[in-house]
């Protein structure tokens, strides 16, 4: 009986210890959660992220509503919101924009480029597979551009196209009847041929967008207009060639960008990746 009583006493003590340990763990978690939520994380937890990474991948569109399932796309609306948020976040010391895009809507690319220029934190563009057309336009908004030797860079040009169903309609016996108010209202209608006057009208706008692109590259990259004009034939070039003509600053990858932040800006980078 004495042994049984001792055993019961030991079990009671063990149970009480277990309960107290559980209560202690609960309050420890509550205290940690309280301080994580309500204190300056940079002081309490030195591992707090201090460098934002924004990915600009695929086709560049203007709004989130334009994003389609199954397609790799980035909306300028979202990226600009991220950059505005970063500007007001004292924890973030620098921004890396990872680019793998061959362009998209001109206004969308310009919006992101201008938002980068407005950003008060140091900015670095890292071109992965491709930074061409609108993708390159975004890159020039950054303080510094890195790319791989194998990256496809440039394509400082503008393209516009339209469909022409006139021969197909003729073969199928379809007759096109036009009812239009306004001389150029149906310009680009695929059911009739484009007139020479309409072609000139469209080329006027294409050339104007091209000129703006050239001027932005020259201004933001510190290049002569004449230099950019020679490069602005719509072609792309590899990383080493792009560096030689001033389209990028350095050959490197994410580790090289992080080292640049350490060496030049005295930032020990802890990355936070924004996901769209």
Residue ranges and their predicted role:
Residues 150-158:
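Active-site loop architecture of trypsin-fold serine endopeptidases
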Residues 1-125, 130-134, 144-147, 160-276:
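N-terminal organellar transit peptides
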């Amino acid at each position: 009986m004495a042994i049984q009583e001792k055993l019961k006493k030991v079990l009671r003590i063990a149970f009480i210890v277990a309960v107290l340990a559980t209560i202690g763990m609960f309050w420890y978690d509550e205290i940690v959660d309280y301080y994580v939520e309500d204190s300056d994380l940079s002081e309490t937890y030195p591992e707090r992220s201090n460098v934002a990474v924004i990915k600009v991948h695929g086709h560049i569109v203007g709004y989130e509503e334009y994003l389609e399932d199954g397609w790799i796309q980035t909306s300028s609306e979202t990226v600009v919101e991220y950059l505005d948020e970063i500007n007001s976040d004292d924890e973030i010391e620098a921004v890396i924009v990872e680019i793998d895009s061959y362009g998209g809507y001109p206004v969308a690319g310009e919006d992101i480029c201008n938002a980068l220029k407005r950003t008060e934190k140091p900015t670095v563009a890292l071109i992965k597979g491709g930074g061409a057309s609108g993708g390159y336009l975004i890159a020039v908004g950054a303080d510094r551009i890195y790319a791989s030797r194998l990256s496809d860079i440039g394509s400082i040009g503008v393209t516009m196209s339209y469909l022409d169903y006139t021969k197909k309609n003729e073969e199928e016996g379809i007759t096109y009847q036009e009812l239009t108010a306004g001389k150029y209202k149906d310009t680009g209608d695929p059911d009739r041929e484009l007139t020479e006057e309409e072609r000139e009208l469209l080329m006027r706008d294409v050339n104007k967008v091209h000129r703006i692109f050239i001027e932005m590259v020259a201004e933001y990259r510190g290049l002569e207009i004449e230099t950019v004009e020679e490069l602005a034939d719509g072609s792309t070039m590899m990383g080493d060639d792009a560096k030689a003509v001033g389209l990028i600053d350095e050959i490197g990858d994410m580790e090289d960008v992080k080292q640049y932040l350490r060496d030049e800006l005295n930032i020990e980078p802890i990355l936070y990746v924004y996901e769209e």
